[in-house]
Amino acid sequence: MMLILLLPLVNAESKQVDLSLESSVADYDVGISTGELSPDGKTVLLVGNEGYVHLISAKNAGDRSLDVELNSARDNDFNDVSWHPRSEAALIAGDFGTAMRYEKIDHSVTIVNGTGAILGRDMSSVEWRSAGDYAYFGGKDGSLWRFSEGTGFVNLGNDADSEITGISCHMNYDLCVVSTISSGLGVIGQAHNVSWISGTRTDTWVDVDCPDASLNECVAFGSGLRMISILLNTVDHTKSDVGSMVEYRTLDGDFISSSRGFSGTSIIHLAPSATVRYEPLNDVAKVQVSSEQMADWDSVISGRQISYVWENSFNSGFVITSNGNVISFEPYQIEIENTMLTTAILIAVSVSVPGVILGLIYMNSPFLQRKYNQIFKKRKR
């Protein structure tokens, strides 16, 4: 039985970041589904509708001269992407049995081995496990597959009966978690067998993430602003469980997906257009960009869905919208107006601080006190 915690506090006391429109990756609506930051932190691979694949700089995402236009030679929609842990290649999952490999060395995008096994199935999710020996694909029909270039695709069995919405693998263990529309949450063990967690089928799960390598847990995000921790049993994955359900009713909109944040955090995407940072180590959620801030900043872009977010440092990174807009964000800087009052305060502080320091030195120095008394007595004479 899951305990549901209603109305937990979400830290939204002040503005967290400043937003700036950098550019767009194209002069038309490219229909970006998602993206992923390479493990080396240098590039971001974007995928989208009608075989769209595009590589951009992670540090200078607004600079179109650094882009690499890729050709997939496919017109099927691409739904997910996952980099290999060594950053040399990435796998792409798409509709109608599409499974592609991007190679960094020559920027080629080619069909992987063994796609005949998934022909006709729409692949919705893909993720490499931490060892980099196998990747897992999930389908809109609920099927789950393991993949390696040597063996191709092998069905895991014990499939879900609804769409796989997300797969995320722990960074220290060869354990992966799975979210679904209506089949609950699952855990894939080291031997590729799937175990479904009881009591999780009643929610609509939109994504899952394992952001903190120091914790033996992941987190699932559900429709209705609901979130739950997945407690991994690293010895026997079938004994993995969930924590208490949390429902963030004070937020506007709804959870739709997530991205990996900086320093072991998750960035939750909300519709229509907002982000929330979740820190699993402290079990704290903080509004990063509110829907009100986004609307005040740009009323047109605020109506577009967030497809991917990444950070190069805490609260410093980029947002990609489904249309292809590139939005940078930086920590919010409070500007102090340079008035006569603030100038007077600064002068007073600059004068008083040295005096306080000298006073403390005098109070703690018997030698200086004796010298002062000697001088004072001489003057009195």
Task: Give the residues covered by each predicted segment.
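Residue-level hotspots at or immediately adjacent to binding/recognition sites across diverse folds
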Residues: 12-381
